[in-house]
Regions:
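Catalytic-site signature of metal-activated, phosphate-bearing donor transferases
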Residues: 1-79, 83
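"A position-specific structural signal for the A-helix of alpha-solenoid helical repeats
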Residues: 70, 109, 142, 149, ...
Length: 219
């Protein structure tokens, strides 16, 4: 279902940013197609997980957290966030290399699943893993959302401002217009319309920000 590129020797290799852009169309689906694909994936992943649980080889057991991660992603794609959280939690209970891309993505998607399932208070536990996973725009933006959902607006603004200092990110806009927009929302909610306008106007042609600018200027 999901492929991971490794070296022929199995050893770690040096990587670099090539500047090449590859468009992956596998998830450019409508809701019905996405649901069918997710259900197919879940069935195959559960079967594989059951197989792995009967094996004792270390190499096979090391695959279990990755399967749990993919199950979590599949349920997340179906917007079944509570189930996604359950699989992410199980996957992260293993002793994992925190530098692996799938582990980083599992942590970040777990955070979004918690927020989407109404578990924002539980998501505050991410403060405890900040030192391990916090060196990216994506994680800092996520922490901004977690603080924002918990009403810790000063902390949220600080995290969003940290996110825009990064040149690259995985999710579009978390190091630019999305972060600025959320800062604007916070300032507007607190009644600081001048500050809100300042950050909304940094969002460029982001429609949501433009709508807020128009509303503030006309009221």
């Amino acid at each position: 279902i999901h492929e991971q590129i490794i070296s022929n020797s199995g050893e770690a290799v040096e990587t670099f940013l090539s500047g090449i852009v590859i468009n992956h169309m596998g998830y450019c689906l409508n809701d019905d197609e996405r649901k069918v694909k997710a259900e197919r994936n879940i069935k195959l992943l559960v079967n594989r997980l059951d197989e792995l649980k009967t094996m004792s080889q270390e190499s096979e057991e090391q695959e279990i957290p990755y399967i749990l991660y993919q199950l979590g992603k599949s349920y997340y794609m179906e917007k079944e966030y509570v189930k996604a959280c359950d699989y992410f939690s199980k996957g992260l209970s293993y002793d994992l290399d925190t530098k692996l891309e799938y582990v980083i993505d599992m942590v970040e998607t777990y955070g979004y699943a918690m927020l989407n399932s109404g578990a924002e208070k539980e998501a505050m536990s991410f403060v405890n893993i900040y030192d391990e996973f916090g060196d990216s725009a994506d994680f800092k933006f996520l922490m901004g959302l977690i603080y924002m959902k918990n009403g810790l607006f000063d902390n949220a603004v600080k995290e969003f401002k940290k996110a825009v200092l990064y040149e690259s990110c995985k999710v579009e806009g978390v190091n630019s217009y999305q972060a600025y927009y959320n800062i604007g929302v916070i300032y507007e909610c607190l009644g600081y319309n001048d500050k809100a306008l300042e950050y909304y106007e940094r969002c460029g042609d982001y429609e949501n920000a433009q709508n807020r600018v128009a509303y503030i200027k006309n009221n």
